[in-house]
Amino acid sequence: MGDPRCAPLLLLLLLPLLFTPPAGDAAVITGACDKDSQCGGGMCCAVSIWVKSIRICTPMGQVGDSCHPLTRKSHVANGRQERRRAKRRKRKKEVPFWGRRMHHTCPCLPGLACLRTSFNRFICLARK
């Protein structure tokens, strides 16, 4: 190591250590999943923002988090059909959801609702 030509190589090897954040500041990347039941409490299995072909455990929406409304327009129909539709809509919002989520966000935590704040922006807010 006394050779001066080794200094640039040593610096190159140690440089990544200088820019690595301490353990407490690093991002936590949750694991891949197929179903909500594979994720811990307060999480759901949602589409990755970066790679659409995989799903990752994602935290459920807290107050102020952006969300997706996950609602359908209701059509005028007889009572039985409307009850079935309402039941299906409710099931889509539940965690664990037994189907495959097609959006990158989870529903809001219990007690919160996904409410419109502007034309195309929805956030989790306390139910009124």
Curated annotation (Swiss-Prot):
Keywords: Biological rhythms, Disulfide bond, Neuropeptide, Secreted, Signal. Residues 1-26 form the signal peptide. Disulfide bonds join 33-45, 39-57, 44-106, 67-114, 108-124. The keyword Repressor does not apply. One of its GO terms (molecular function) is G protein-coupled receptor binding. One of its GO terms (cellular component) is extracellular region. Expressed in the SCN and among a few other discrete brain areas, including the islands of Calleja, media l preoptic area of the hypothalamus and the shell of the nucleus accumbens. Highly expressed in testis. In the SCN, expression subjected to high amplitude of circadian oscillation. Its main location: secreted. The keyword Secreted applies. It is found in: Secreted. Induction: Activated by CLOCK and BMAL1 heterodimers and light; inhibited by period genes (PER1, PER2 and PER3) and cryptochrome genes (CRY1 and CRY2). GO terms for biological process: angiogenesis; chemotaxis; circadian rhythm; coronary vasculature development; endothelial cell proliferation; epicardium-derived cardiac endothelial cell differentiation; epicardium-derived cardiac vascular smooth muscle cell differentiation; negative regulation of apoptotic process. Pfam families: Prokineticin. May function as an output molecule from the suprachiasmatic nucleus (SCN) that transmits behavioral circadian rhythm. May also function locally within the SCN to synchronize output. Potently contracts gastrointestinal (GI) smooth muscle. Belongs to the AVIT (prokineticin) family. This is Prokineticin-2. It comes from Mus musculus (Mouse). The gene is Prok2.
